[in-house]
Amino acid sequence: MEAGGDNAVPAPGGVEDLVDTQFPREEAGDSERVHASTLDPGDGDPEDTGSKDQPSSLLSPLPQTEAASSTCEHWETAAASDSSPPGEPESNSEGQGEDPDDGGDPSDEDWRSQRKHVFVLSEAGKPIYSRYGSVEALSATMGVMTALVSFVQSAGDAIRAIYAEDHKLVFLQQGPLLLVAVSRTPQSAAQLRGELLAVHAQIVSTLTRASVARIFAHKQNYDLRRLLAGSERTLDRLLDSVEQDPGALLLGAVRCVPLARPLRDALGTLLRRCTAPGLALSVLAVGGRLITVAQERNVLAECRLDPADLQLLLDWVGAPAFAAGEAWAPVCLPRFNPDGFFYAYVARLDSMPVCLLLLGTNREAFHAMAACRRLVEDGMHNLGALRTLGEAANFSNGPAASAPAYSVQAVGAPGLRHFLYKPLDIPEQHRQLPQFTSPELEAPYSREEERQRLSDLYHRLHARLHSTSRPLRLIYHVAEKETLLAWVTSKFELYTCLSPLVTKAGAILVVTKLLRWVRKEEDRLFIRYPPKYSTPPSTSADQAPNNGLFTGL
């Protein structure tokens, strides 16, 4: 059942509006649908499906058109008839993004049974990455994709998506790279396109956009896997997170570790006191979740770190390569400057899951960064922060190992199983740090299949709320195993999963308790007032802020 549209629900702004809302009746039908009709294939272009405070330019592709579904049938036929023998699994160093248990031949039943495939290839059709299977065995399939794109481009157009029955094929051209998602999940084309953008950003973070363009300008059929060795597993983890824990990509925000505000403020002050030559950004994180961040005025000038870049860093430091000790590596932030590198110092603190990330512009500053690490570590010991974070991490049993979280029982709202909450009423000066919060996934969502099913429901609700053809403000959906309520206002974006036995009146009561609890705990759940960045140096009218300080190694 839905309550939506201009005539159904006035612009809500608080719990009182939800109580007064009259939910229209829904005809008996498939209870698993969010709406009686199927979703509009055109729902949610990237610029409209992002968060309310996210600039549209971050996800806007070039103007494109959609191809007919008959082309998809041609692709499937060609893939099924590919006579290439299954490729032998290669080591990580060879650039395989495959699961060793999955066959590499498109005619293999296990490969075809996957819900979603993601491919990366060059304009010349050279395979670069495949989520499942051997890229060698998929070379003919990728050749068909290249032919489709070239055929549409020859008519002066660009292909965006193909729809055929329960499949979506989404294409994204980024310079010399072509990214393709083939999906039969409930994700909209816009959500899949955002996922492809995240995959491209991960590739750029390793090589930079300028390097990729220069390589293929020199040699169109270059095998980029040589330079991406070791990055495939990172791409695999990124795509897995969308299935298991979609909040960050879906809401365009980062998740913070629940922490008492005085301790968080003290940690922010500690980071600002530790300086090194060329230090640009200091980040404390644990389990892929943000503790606090401090930005250096003199290096970043008027630039602000985009949440997509920050989430990329949080995912990056979660790689097994950084599980112990310290590391020094270049990393590109695609939103900040896709053509240059920072130099990143990554270290675990005191054998704990707490991670310190220091970004700088000086390639010779490793020892200075290591000295900063010792100061931060000593300061956290004095504050008792390592002990506090360690105790919180021991509570977690979720997919993100050692990620401090909280139980949904802390809300004190019987019938509430899970939720995603993103505040939108952030002070204007802090909108560069969109955040969201969600509790630990507990029973009945302890198993991977159940988490995937909940993720599908969240994606479906998000697509309806942010549809370009008929955006909704409020959705009340009764499914077979749970009841869901999604609500977006000028103050927040909320997705709640409730017991299937909850009535409409009960759902309203649960949401009321949840909103009151979030308001009470907001200083602990969010960085409501992030560590004050130093005031940027003033620039004259004829001197634009410099965003390209780092031009590579």
UniProtKB/Swiss-Prot annotation:
Please give the GO cellular component terms listed in this UniProt entry. Answer: cytoplasm; Mon1-Ccz1 complex
Question: What Gene Ontology terms for biological process does this UniProt record contain?
Answer: early viral transcription; late viral transcription; protein targeting to vacuole; vesicle-mediated transport
| PTM-bearing positions, type Phosphoserine | S57
Q: Which Pfam families match?
A: Fuz_longin_1 (PF19036), Fuz_longin_2 (PF19037), Fuz_longin_3 (PF19038)
Q: Where is the composition biased (Basic and acidic residues)?
A: 23-35
Subunit relationships: Interacts with CCNT2; down-regulates CCNT2-mediated activation of viral promoters during herpes simplex virus 1/HHV-1 infection. Found in a complex with RMC1, CCZ1 MON1A and MON1B.
> What protein am I looking at?
Vacuolar fusion protein MON1 homolog B
Which keywords has UniProt assigned to this entry?
A: Acetylation, Phosphoprotein
User: Where on the chain is N-acetylmethionine found, per UniProt?
Assistant: M1
Composition-biased stretches, type Low complexity, lie in 78-95
Q: Where is the composition biased (Acidic residues)?
A: 96-108
Name the domain of life this protein comes from: Eukaryota
Sequence segments annotated as region (Disordered):
1-111, 534-553
In this chain, composition skew of type Polar residues spans 52-72, 541-553
Family membership: Belongs to the MON1/SAND family.
